[in-house]
């Protein structure tokens, strides 16, 4: 795999920070720092590097997309992360969001159902020296039970309902951020807190549009 970088992207990165993140309410210093540190141009399709810091989703391999910078930052901030947290991500894609999370928390576990994406994301993250990210090819709706429980779980695809396997893999006090909706392409971003072994509390954050979450506990 060859990684592609574009010189003189610093100005665009600053525009992203000032106009797409700060101006829209992102305030968590750790999230902002991570968004500045991670080179989004290394995670987009070849030939689209100059668009890396524009605030919209871009196509990647396998007919999938890399989320716009604002939604990556918003979801990370909504997880209410601390440096010692262990995070599970469902939907690795090119690995960009996992890379951002890895600059904030101790360890990231990420699951991708598409073999080609899982393989290329693993290679990319390894080449970029993100040593605290672990990639698994598999059905993300089932989580990654081997390393559960997690302090936070983030899902980057829209589910018809809250996947029970993911709820069960949250630690008490843990947060799940996930798009949920009755149609595959229009959802409400929801944050769920596990307040005890048996009790969960959820709140709606904002309307979003994600690709469908495919799997045994998804579409």
UniProtKB/Swiss-Prot annotation:
> What's this protein's name?
Protein-L-isoaspartate O-methyltransferase 1
Which family, according to UniProt?
Belongs to the methyltransferase superfamily. L-isoaspartyl/D-aspartyl protein methyltransferase family.
Q: Which UniProt keywords apply?
A: Cytoplasm, Methyltransferase, S-adenosyl-L-methionine, Transferase
Q: Where does it reside?
A: Cytoplasm
Under the heading PANTHER family, the entry gives:
PROTEIN-L-ISOASPARTATE O-METHYLTRANSFERASE, PROTEIN-L-ISOASPARTATE(D-ASPARTATE) O-METHYLTRANSFERASE
Which residues does the entry assign to the active site, renumbered to this chain? 67
What task does this protein carry out?
Catalyzes the methyl esterification of L-isoaspartyl residues in peptides and proteins that result from spontaneous decomposition of normal L-aspartyl and L-asparaginyl residues. It plays a role in the repair and/or degradation of damaged proteins.
Coarse class of the protein's main subcellular location? cytoplasm
Q: Which gene encodes it?
A: pcm1
Write down the PROSITE patterns for this protein, in alphabetical order: PCMT
Might you give the EC number(s) for this enzyme? Answer: 2.1.1.77
What Gene Ontology terms describe what this protein does at the molecular function level?
protein-L-isoaspartate (D-aspartate) O-methyltransferase activity
Which biological process terms from the Gene Ontology are attached to this UniProt entry? methylation; protein modification process; protein repair
What does it catalyze?
A: [protein]-L-isoaspartate + S-adenosyl-L-methionine = [protein]-L-isoaspartate alpha-methyl ester + S-adenosyl-L-homocysteine
GO CC, one annotated term:
cytoplasm
